[in-house]
Amino acid sequence: APVMGFQGMR
């Protein structure tokens, strides 16, 4: 799930 948050930060 953390990966999804990483994309949202970009």
UniProtKB/Swiss-Prot annotation:
Its main location: secreted. Keywords: Amidation, Neuropeptide, Secreted. It comes from the Eukaryota. It is found in: Secreted. The modification Arginine amide is found at R10. One of its GO terms (biological process) is neuropeptide signaling pathway. One of its GO terms (cellular component) is extracellular region. Expressed in the antennal lobe (at protein level). The keyword Secreted applies. This is Tachykinin-related peptide 5. It comes from Oncopeltus fasciatus.
